[in-house]
């Protein structure tokens, strides 16, 4: 499970666009997808507002259509698997702020489509924020500061990659030095 840490000095629009691409590109079915974010509380509301705005603009459609932003998941059984995880997140009490279940595409009504799905206020004890969903599902964990965000990221057993969004040279260096992610993005 790859993580990003979003600090309050990030370039907001650029950060959100990068995260949307990483979380929802390839329907979230790639090893380097970004399913989990630790967002500094002081920027979280503005971040979530912009994230919803951009995510709702994504065009869902067949993968071969060059205007498509979000294609289908690979199989019907995987669609059911991802939808099961979405329900699990709801049952655990995560705040579902964008629900991609029920997405349809005209002419492809039997396709395996799931729209962008975003949970906010995910806590450390929720499985939705700990396990690999492997679909277009993004979990937001609100954190007080760099230290809490880094700790949450490092406490997760999965760490293909990790990325920080900040304008701070200090936090960039600290992140690169201290993250457990296999690949590091700054």
Question: Where are the model-predicted features located?
Answer:
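Conserved C-terminal structural/oligomerization subdomain of aldehyde/semialdehyde dehydrogenase
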Residues: 5, 10, 59, 86, ...
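ALDH superfamily catalytic-core signature
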Residues: 1-123, 152, 186
């Amino acid at each position: 499970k790859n993580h990003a840490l979003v600090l309050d000095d990030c370039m907001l629009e650029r950060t959100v666009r990068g995260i949307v691409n990483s979380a929802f590109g390839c329907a979230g079915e790639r090893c380097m997808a970004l399913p989990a974010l630790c967002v500094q509380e002081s920027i979280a509301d503005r971040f979530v507002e912009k994230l919803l705005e951009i995510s709702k603009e994504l065009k869902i459609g067949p993968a071969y259509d060059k205007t498509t932003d979000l294609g289908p998941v690979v199989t019907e059984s995987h669609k059911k698997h991802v939808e099961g995880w979405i329900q699990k997140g709801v049952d655990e009490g995560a705040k579902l702020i964008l629900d991609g279940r029920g997405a349809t595409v005209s002419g492809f009504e039997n396709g395996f489509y799931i729209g962008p799905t975003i949970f906010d206020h995910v806590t450390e004890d929720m499985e939705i924020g700990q396990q690999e969903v492997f679909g277009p599902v993004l979990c937001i964990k609100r954190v007080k500061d760099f230290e809490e965000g880094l700790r949450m990221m490092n406490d997760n057993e999965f760490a293909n990659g990790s990325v920080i969004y900040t304008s701070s040279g200090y936090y960039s260096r600290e992140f690169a030095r201290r993250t457990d992610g296999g690949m590091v993005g700054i």
